[in-house]
Amino acid sequence: MTAIEPGYIPLSRSGELERRAEALEARLASCDICPRNCKVNRLHNETGFCHSGFLPIVSSVCAHRGEEPAISGQRGSGTVFFGNCNMRCVYCQNYQISQSWREQKSNEIDCKALAANMLYLQDDLKCHNINFVSPSHFVPQMVRAIAEAAPMGLHIPIVYNTGGYDSLDTLKQLDGIIDIYLPDIRYADNKTARKYSQAPDYVVHNRAAIKEMYRQVGDLVVDKNGLAQRGLIVRHLILPNGLAGSEESLEWISGELSPAVTMSVMSQYSPQHRAHKIPLLSRKISVAEYEGVVGVLFRLSMENGWLQELSSSDTYLPDFEREGHPFDTDPKEVQETLSCREFEGVPHSIKKSPKNGGLRGLNITEDKSSPQTGERAQ
């Protein structure tokens, strides 16, 4: 079997990556990059809902060991945290960088500098992938940086780590560029999305986006070391009082996509930012709420992915005001504090993940061809 090569590499060689970057940048003149369709001229630094102009805002660059095992591996995911956001989640754990627009202005860099940071993550920190967090409002800048870095030797997979409020037209221009899509499916009800994230049309855009992502990359494929090379992982954060619409969202994934879609079901919710002032969001999830979602996974025979242990809400929250690494926690400590328990009634294929104690692993397809990206990462 031919080794998996990141999709952006042949696109770079053919010149298509440069053409995509130019086409996306042109759309900034009347910005419609995300579903907000603000129509401001970001080429001239006009700003809309996301408070972002032309230059990318990069709030942190680090090797992140707290992602899913197939993303973090042993040496971490090369994470690029973009500042600002196209949503306004009242419980956002990254609120220090997502909702502090004036402060984030100082984190603007040009795309050449972003490309250099990507190569630093790959070559110096030996990360397994480049993981763009909250990229929806900076897609043109992201693609431009990939186009700059590819001829300079970038060769590891690209992860698109998004809250899921993405434009279908924008995603279509990412076809072949993104190797691994990591979207949230945050809500099943638009009224809830409007109330808590100021995204009144979230569900229709989110579901269309996830369908398109699945069309592009399909089911998750990992190398011989369990590292993701290509595919879709859908994240779902359980919220208290059923606000995430977990059952409806999981039923939609199972019915509209496939029960085989790789899921990352997270129990780590804790009331951050303004959530502690909102009664329905002011507590962690209960055991009954957690077990209810596990029961839905069982009923739908969704056996691929990871299930986060209930105790995971207690630790490992980022602090972007800390000097250096926002997750300045000993990796061993993370493994211990995010430990999982066996859960009676969950499909028999679920097992404790050997790479990250905080996520219970399920079945994932292995690419037995020893992809070059996996071999280089060892």
Regions found by a protein language model. Name each.
Residues 175-190, 260-269:
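Non-cysteine beta-strand/loop elements that form the S-adenosyl-L-methionine
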